[in-house]
A protein has these predicted regions:
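Sec-dependent signal peptide cleavage junction
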Residues: 19-33, 298
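Periplasmic-binding protein-like
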Residues: 145-152, 254-274
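A conserved helix-loop-strand patch within extracytoplasmic ligand-binding domains
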Residues: 108-157
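Alpha-to-beta junction loops
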Residues: 79-89, 133, 156, 177-180, ...
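A bilobed periplasmic-binding-protein/Venus flytrap-type ligand-binding module shared by bacterial periplasmic
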Residues: 115-126, 231-244
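Short, well-ordered beta-strand elements
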Residues: 32-43, 61-67, 133-135
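Ligand-binding "clamshell"
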Residues: 96-108, 121-123, 195, 200, ...
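Short helix-initiation/N-cap motifs at beta->coil->alpha
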Residues: 65-76, 164-191
Length: 298
């Protein structure tokens, strides 16, 4: 009789483990209770998540948001399984982190991007640029490249072919007015606006400087730009959990019209909902081309 009971318990445990690991997705105890634990940066990520809480609650999910003030721990706590997801980073940062730290994090969905903009300093229009004027840009690799690409898109400079999202000042091929590019830490760029012709800022620093992207920028990245697609801020999860019910619910709400409206109204262009329709269109086109090639081969 005792042996029969032990077999029953063992069978129950085995079935439970099988259910928890079905399709390679490990469901945490918190997920069973309807709780989604997310690590996030304060602005705008945690603010957006707070707006999503009541919507998720209506769907039966409790959203537990913890704010982190660094860019390392949010990934480590997701890798360890202590948190279900994080919301603070873009894809290049995630890829680099995985490579350097040996983690296994993946993109579960793009939510927003923070567009770079060119803002007035001592000059109001790019047409007012004169020989030897100075433009201030961030000096870190990622943000400097975005700034230089934006200047190129607006006819200020020309970069070498292929420079792309790794461009530096050394890649400037044409500079008709010999504009001086002053490289500063990102947080310092807006502080020299009274000393230079223009400053090039990311959305969050534009907000801190009192700029409105939609009203004050002379030019800014668009939602279909290479930079927007590359530097979209994402929900990141441990590999294998991207298709879990909880994560899909979270991403769906963050991409809903309610959250898009909140982002547009609150951040006035400094934070923009990511529109992946163009990306999907590109993917569909690529698939159609592949099918056409297959038919031709047949």
């Amino acid at each position: 009789m005792r042996t029969k009971k032990l077999l029953t318990v063992s069978l129950t445990a085995a079935l439970t483990i099988a259910a928890l690991t079905a399709n390679g997705v490990i469901v945490s105890a918190d997920a069973e209770k309807g709780t989604i634990k997310v690590a996030a940066s304060a602005t705008p990520h945690a603010e957006i998540l707070e707006e999503a809480k009541p919507i998720l609650e209506e769907e039966g999910w409790e959203l537990d948001v913890t704010v982190f003030d660094d860019y390392v721990q949010p990934n480590l706590v997701v890798e360890s399984g202590d948190f279900d997801a994080n919301y603070f980073q873009h894809i290049p940062y995630l890829d680099n982190f995985n490579e350097e730290q040996g983690t296994h994090l993946v993109n579960a969905g793009g939510i927003h991007y923070e567009p770079f903009g060119i803002y007035p300093g001592t000059k109001e229009k790019l047409d007012d640029l004169e020989e030897g004027d100075t433009i201030a840009v961030p000096n870190d690799t990622t943000n400097e490249a975005r700034a230089l690409l934006l200047l190129q898109d607006n006819g200020v400079i020309t970069l070498k072919d292929g420079a792309g999202l790794e461009a530096t000042v050394k890649d400037i091929e044409e500079n008709p007015k010999n504009i001086k590019i002053e490289e500063l830490e990102a947080a310092q760029v807006s502080r020299v606006k009274d000393e230079v012709a223009f400053v090039v800022l990311n959305g969050n620093y534009a907000l801190q400087a009192g700029y409105s992207v939609s009203k004050d920028s002379i030019a800014h990245e668009t939602s279909d730009s290479e930079a927007a697609k590359t530097y979209v801020n994402i929900i990141a999860v441990k590999e294998g959990n991207e298709d879990s019910e909880a994560i899909k619910a979270l991403v769906d709400v963050l991409k809903s019209d309610e959250i898009k409206d909140f982002i547009n109204e609150k951040y006035d262009g400094a934070v923009v909902p990511f529109d992946d329709s163009a990306e999907n269109t590109d993917a569909d086109a690529a698939e159609e081309d592949t099918e056409a090639e297959t038919e031709d081969a047949e």
